[in-house]
């Protein structure tokens, strides 16, 4: 059972431009982000594959701007829950929490923000999605529009990082 998953990260938002941690906060694409996505041109075959997307507006809007007319929303593709860190700049969190923050960042897949989820938990959320894709799209390519934290977790699963 072989399937291929092509992954696209959503376009930039105002929070991306300010360096703020977004997580599940539903921030739309910025005007600059919309223009950046509109300048991209995907290969013609992209319109012929099945697409899934995060439920967050920035991912859905990215798909629409790319000309993808049909997308299945899958909650498992939602961005990492960064809990209490959402809306903050990482530099500010490091300044506020000092060594505690640096120690947290060294935890890798087990880094868990207060009130949030770890990359390992994101991997656990994604594994059933990957099995579903493999079962329903045998020998086919499927596209996904999602977020940086999810893409990092997908890479972790693909590479066997722990």
Tell me the role of every PLM-derived stretch.
Residues 2-3, 8-72, 96:
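Active-site-proximal alpha-helix that buttresses catalytic centers in soluble enzyme cores
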Residues 2, 14, 60, 68, ...:
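Active-site-adjacent alpha-helix immediately C-terminal to a catalytic or transition-state-stabilizing loop
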Residues 66-127:
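Phosphate-handling substructures
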Residues 17-18, 83-84, 155-156:
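Short, function-defining helix-loop hinge/capping sites that tune catalysis or transport
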Residues 55, 75, 148:
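Short secondary-structure boundary segments
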Residues 37, 59, 90, 98-102, ...:
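A general structural signal for well-ordered alpha-helical segments in protein cores
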Residues 53-54, 124, 145-146:
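Short beta-strand scaffold positions
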């Amino acid at each position: 059972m072989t399937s291929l998953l092509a992954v696209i990260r959503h376009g930039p938002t105002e929070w991306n431009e300010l360096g703020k941690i977004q997580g599940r906060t539903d921030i739309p694409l910025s005007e600059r982000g919309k223009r950046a996505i509109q300048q991209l041109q995907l290969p013609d075959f992209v319109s012929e594959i099945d697409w899934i997307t995060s439920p967050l507006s920035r991912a859905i809007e990215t798909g629409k701007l790319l000309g993808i007319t049909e997308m299945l929303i899958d909650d498992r593709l939602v961005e990492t829950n960064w809990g209490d860190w959402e809306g903050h700049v990482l530099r500010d969190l490091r300044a506020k929490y000092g060594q505690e923050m640096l120690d947290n960042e060294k935890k890798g897949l087990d880094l868990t923000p207060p009130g949030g989820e770890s990359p390992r938990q994101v991997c656990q959320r994604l594994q059933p999605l990957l099995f579903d894709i493999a079962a329903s799209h045998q020998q086919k390519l499927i596209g996904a529009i999602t977020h940086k934290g999810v893409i990092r977790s997908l890479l972790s699963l693909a590479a066997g990082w722990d």
